[in-house]
Amino acid sequence: MDDLKSKYLAAIAEAADESALETLRVAAVGKKGEISLKMRELGKMTPEERKTAGPALNALKDEINSALAAKKAALADAALDERLRSEWLDVTLPGRQRPAGTLHPISQVSEEVAAIFADMGFAVAEGPRVESDWYNFDALNIPGHHPARAEMDTFYMKRAEGDDRPPHVLRTHTSPVQIRAMQEHGAPIRVICPGGVYRCDYDQTHTPMFHQVEGLAIDRDISMANLKWVLEEFVRSYFEVDDVELRFRASHFPFTEPSAEVDIRCSWEGGQLKVGEGDDWLEILGSGMVHPKVLEAGGIDPTQWQGFAFGMGIDRIAMLKYGIPDLRAFFDSDLRWLRNYGFSALDVPTVHAGLSR
């Protein structure tokens, strides 16, 4: 046994790698190893011989296993030391630049619009995107025979058989939020209502989903003059120009009376829009004085209060300001497009510090 002990302890000490160590383990204490075979011979010995040989063989086996484990740990430590020597890292080097996300142009323009109107005392109001047809149409003085209520223009929610609740639609404009704001806060009130809206339309300048912002101001003795001033201030701030000329054209909207579409004087140079100069006119929004029936639907007495309202497409004014040619690209989720037209999340737009960077 002393010879076996010396033989294997010396071989274990000289093992150069884990493969050689495994070969020694199998040769010594494996199923057919020398020490294992010796232990099988215990059954052939007399009781007196077993009392002496048994403990000695067990002690030898334990010592060999301990030597194998210690050598394996030493080899692992040596391998780690060698790896650390060859694969060093300079911790003083700067880290890798992680690509930062950008704000979508719709989010940026929504923030710009909110900042401009907040400076004029307007709060932001929001409402549900699934609306009853009363809020979306009836409360806004849109009659039942109006083309906008047809299924070819409006997304109606499917109803289960026996469901007798009023019809619901994906809102076609953010005007229902104005009704809800009047019902909740009464008069006087100044709010803008940004958000997503839905219509059955799809081409280069129309998508089934798009974004609008509508404004509402109600007080005593409000007139079209107040509306004109608010819109001039907005256009001047949004397009970041010192001078702007607006043209009000008579129009018809069921929810305002009188109604007007608003154009801005502009020019196009190299495909870029220049506001406040040139001989062209570009329509940007609709507006007017709030119809008395709409005030009544909002719970406001039209004999005591007057107001104006306006609405514009956020996607459209984003395209005009930032030179985006196709409305459909807003919804394509193309990372290349988003990196090109996106904005830093750290640049919060304000009227005094600047809207865009």
Curated annotation (Swiss-Prot):
It catalyses: tRNA(Phe) + L-phenylalanine + ATP = L-phenylalanyl-tRNA(Phe) + AMP + diphosphate + H(+). It is an enzyme of class 6 (ligase). It is found in: Cytoplasm. GO terms for biological process: phenylalanyl-tRNA aminoacylation. The keyword Hydrolase does not apply. Keywords: Aminoacyl-tRNA synthetase, ATP-binding, Cytoplasm, Ligase, Magnesium, Metal-binding, Nucleotide-binding, Protein biosynthesis. Its cofactor is Mg(2+). Its EC number is 6.1.1.20. GO terms for cellular component: cytoplasm. Binds 2 magnesium ions per tetramer. SUPFAM superfamilies: Class II aaRS and biotin synthetases (SSF55681), tRNA-binding arm (SSF46589). Disulfide bonds: none annotated. One of its GO terms (molecular function) is tRNA binding. Gene3D superfamilies: Bira Bifunctional Protein, Domain 2. It holds the Pfam family tRNA-synt_2d. Belongs to the class-II aminoacyl-tRNA synthetase family. Phe-tRNA synthetase alpha subunit type 1 subfamily. Tetramer of two alpha and two beta subunits. HAMAP family: Phe_tRNA_synth_alpha1 (MF_00281). This is Phenylalanine--tRNA ligase alpha subunit. It comes from Dinoroseobacter shibae (strain DSM 16493 / NCIMB 14021 / DFL 12). The gene is pheS.
